[in-house]
A protein has these predicted regions:
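Conserved sequence signature across two-component system core domains
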Residues: 8-9, 33, 51
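Two-component/phosphorelay signaling modules centered on CheY-like receiver
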Residues: 12-31
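As written
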Residues: 62, 91-98
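Hydrophobic/aromatic residues positioned on beta-strands within the core alpha/beta folds
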Residues: 79-80, 102
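C-terminal output helix
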Residues: 86, 103-114, 118
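The feature encodes the CheY-like receiver
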Residues: 32, 58
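Active-site residues of response regulator receiver
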Residues: 54
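Acidic catalytic/metal-coordinating carboxylates
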Residues: 35-38, 61-64
Length: 118
C-alpha cells in the first residue's frame, strides 16, 4: 500500500507541483492545506501517514503547526526553501521526523527519511 501524504503550504503552485512529483513517485497525496487550521482538520479527517509542512506559512509558523498535528500514527516532515542550517536546532527540538529542502523533495527522499520502503 502506498504512503498517504498531506501537503501543507500557502503556495498553490507549490502544492500542485509537489502533488504531481510525489504521485509520480508512487505516493498517494490524500489532501492539501494552506493554513494550520486546515492542516489540523485534514489530519483528523484523512489520517495521512506523513504530513509535509512548510516552515513559513502565511502568518503562521510551521513549527507550531507541526506541534499541533504530530501524532503516533502521523509523521511530520518540515519543508522549506531555506537551508536546514538556518533552523537545525528548531527542527531537532520539534516533533518532526526531519527536514527536506523543497528542491530535494521526492517520494524517495521522504521514504528514506522515514525509513520506509513502500
Amino acid at each position: 500500500m502506498s504512503m498517504r501524504c498531506l501537503l501543507v503550504d500557502d503556495s498553490a503552485r507549490f502544492l500542485e507541483a509537489a502533488r504531481a512529483l510525489l504521485e509520480r513517485g508512487g505516493m498517494q497525496v490524500v489532501g492539501v492545506a494552506s493554513t494550520g487550521a486546515e492542516a489540523v482538520s485534514r489530519v483528523h479527517d484523512l489520517v495521512p501517514d506523513v504530513v509535509l509542512v512548510d516552515l513559513d506559512l502565511d502568518g503562521e509558523n510551521g513549527f507550531d503547526v507541526a506541534l499541533r498535528i504530530a501524532g503516533d500514527t502521523t509523521a511530520v516532515i518540515l519543508i522549506s526553501t531555506h537551508a536546514l542550517e538556518d533552523f537545525q536546532e528548531l527542527v531537532a527540538a520539534s516533533p518532526a521526523r526531519g527536514f527536506l529542502h523543497k528542491s530535494a523533495l521526492s517520494a524517495g527522499a521522504i521514504r528514506e527519511l522515514l525509513g520506509r520502503e513502500d
